[in-house]
Amino acid sequence: AGIIAGAVLDNTVLTVVALILYGAGAAANLQARYAGADLATPARRARAVSTVLVATTLGGVAGANLTAPTGVLAAALGLPPLTGLFLVSGAAYALAAVVLVVWLRPDPFLLARTLPPDGQARPVAAGSEHGLGVPQGILVMLLTQIVMIAIMTMTPIHMLGHGHGTGAAGLVIALHVGAMFLPSPLSGILVDRYGRRAIAVAAAVTLAVAAVLAASAPEDSVVLLALALILLGLGWNFGMVSGTAIITDAAPVATRAKTQGTADVAIAIGGAVGGMSSGFIVVGIGYPALALLGGLIALAIVPAVLRRVARTTTS
């Protein structure tokens, strides 16, 4: 409502404040992946996370294709056409709230707190790597987010600057977004089967390959840039699913929600830093250098996840 009012009144301050509040919905949407894992056994936890992640793809694809029809709806109501999507999203948020209040009972997080701690009564997933802890999980997702946002943000600008149309740039981004979420069921199976650490390393390698491909792609090659962005999305997916599973495994149930919230704040800040700094980097040293720098950052995930947390013993 605030965004629509800001658009109608041509009030930038109101619009910005409303958009900040609107962002809370996106944060809740991302947090939903943790809720999917609250009651999952360790052996199926990553698959539970991935199921929620792939559901967000449906909304993303549908929303991206509603711009024109919702614009017609807004115009019919005497509102600016671009407010149409916010009319629909407001209704969708309200419906989601009703679903949560009516059907999410009992709250899976509260129910999980009444169950025995992980490792006592519940089976441990093969390859769960208990040496990994919360800091590693946060670092995996943080570096993944920084690399993905930085390269993704500047790729359309790079394409437009070299003569490609908005249609080509839009197609590349659409393929990228699809690769971010559609592989989630497969990612969940891989994480549960081969372990959090292995797929986190796979995320780093995939992101690095994507970065090298983006840096070396000829300026007139939409196909290679699209392939680079697809791999970038896939690497992000691997990192997000494995990092989420690492954190959920390591955090005690009593403090898990706080830990998960802290992780997502770090991810959001990292994404903002990656997005804002990417433009300055491209202006200073170019898009290929930005991509290669992103690849180096991604490879920092490997030593982070291969380093086990030191165990302390008491005599």
Give the residues covered by each predicted segment.
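Helix-to-loop junctions at the C-terminal end of transmembrane segments
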Residues: 183-196, 282
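Glycine-rich segments within core transmembrane alpha-helices of 12-TM secondary carriers
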Residues: 48-67, 266-274
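Intracellular juxtamembrane helix-capping segments at the cytosolic ends
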Residues: 27-41, 238-251
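Pair of pore-lining "gating" transmembrane helices in MFS-fold secondary transporters
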Residues: 20, 130-151, 230
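Juxtamembrane intracellular "pre-TM" segments in multi-pass secondary transporters
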Residues: 105-140
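C-terminal ends and interior cores of transmembrane alpha-helices
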Residues: 1-9, 206-219
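Hydrophobic core of transmembrane alpha-helices in multi-pass small-molecule transporters
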Residues: 12-27, 224-238
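C-terminal membrane-cytosol helix-exit motif in multi-pass small-molecule transporters
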Residues: 67-68, 72, 90-115, 304-308
